[in-house]
Design a protein with these regions (language model features):
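Intrinsically disordered, low-complexity regions enriched in acidic/Ser/Thr/Pro/Gln residues
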Residues: 1-93, 100, 215-236
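Buried hydrophobic positions in well-ordered alpha/beta secondary-structure cores of metabolic enzymes
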Residues: 33, 122, 183-185
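Structural motif
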Residues: 40-41, 59-62, 99-102, 127-131, ...
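Extracellular/luminal Protease-associated
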Residues: 91-133
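A contiguous pocket-lining binding segment that forms or flanks enzyme active sites
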Residues: 132-133, 139-187
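A hydrophobic, small-residue-rich beta->alpha segment in the mid-to-C-terminal subdomain
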Residues: 186-226
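Long, low-complexity intrinsically disordered regions
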Residues: 237-256
């Protein structure tokens, strides 16, 4: 008898941690992840479709594509009821508040991963964003939505031409990065980054400290100070930062 091994359920990252992570910079985040041994957490080659950029963080809901096959991926698979060959609709209707849908399109931008109708449905269900390493369609509509939408391109070509939705909520690769269900997807104006779920709370703590420190360092650089001992900060500089915070963060003393 064959034993089918099951992964443990993903660690649940609370909305409180997500909201804190949404406020940290991608620079601090990737630096802190690098210190922990995660060398490349950034999804490369993607850009936001909508101009109303807002920082976000959410739990990954994953969708895995394989190449389409002519005898399966026909228009008839767009069924009016749940069906094994229409998993994309199933996934959209499973999305819960706080999730970011991440689509592994095998870096194939020849056909749209999805379009305005499905993305709108996910947004209404409480998703925090959607990401693909392929393309989306309906860019005119998507660009006006107050919702994070990242992709490698735009095309009107239907998904059925090139993509079959093979799995939901399994480990995937998107834009060269491994993503497990429940990992945190972080986005700002620069990047989409992945945070392993088990270190999300630690990253929130570390990045908040680093962002605060770097805001202080930036003021000193703007005031004309040289980088040596300032950036990266020496222990003396860190102590000066602590004293500055304790003193009420007096900006004028740094810029005079």
């Amino acid at each position: 008898m064959t034993t089918i091994l099951q992964r443990d359920p993903p660690i649940f990252v609370s909305d409180d941690i997500l909201n804190r992570l949404a406020k940290v910079s991608s620079g601090s985040l990737t630096t802190q992840l690098f210190k922990k041994g995660y060398r490349q957490p950034v999804l490369m080659g993607l850009a936001p479709l909508n101009k109303k950029l807002k920082p976000f963080a959410g739990r990954a809901y994953t969708m895995r594509f394989i190449p389409a096959r002519e005898d399966i991926d026909t228009y008839a698979t767009l069924t009016t009821e749940p069906h094994i060959n229409n998993l994309q609709w199933v996934g959209v209707e499973q999305v819960t508040p706080g999730e970011v849908v991440v689509i592994d399109s095998n870096r194939n931008a020849a056909a749209a991963s999805m379009g305005n109708m499905l993305i709108t449905r996910m947004m209404v269900r409480g998703a925090r964003g959607v990401v693909t390493d392929g393309s989306f369609r309906d860019a005119t509509e998507l660009s006006g939505m107050d919702f994070p939408i990242w992709s490698a391109g735009v095309t009107a070509t239907t998904r059925l031409s090139f993509h079959h939705v093979a799995d939901l909520q399994v480990p995937i690769g998107c834009a060269g990065v491994a993503i497990y269900p429940g990992d945190v997807i972080h986005g700002d104006g620069d990047n989409i980054s992945v945070i392993p779920a088990h270190c999300a709370a630690e990253m929130a703590n570390l990045c908040e400290v680093q962002d605060d420190l770097e805001a202080y360092l930036a003021l000193r650089v703007q005031a004309g100070e040289a980088l040596w001992g300032l950036y990266p900060p020496s222990q003396a500089t860190r102590d000066q930062h602590k004293a500055w915070v304790a003193g009420g963060r007096p900006v004028q003393t740094l810029t005079q």
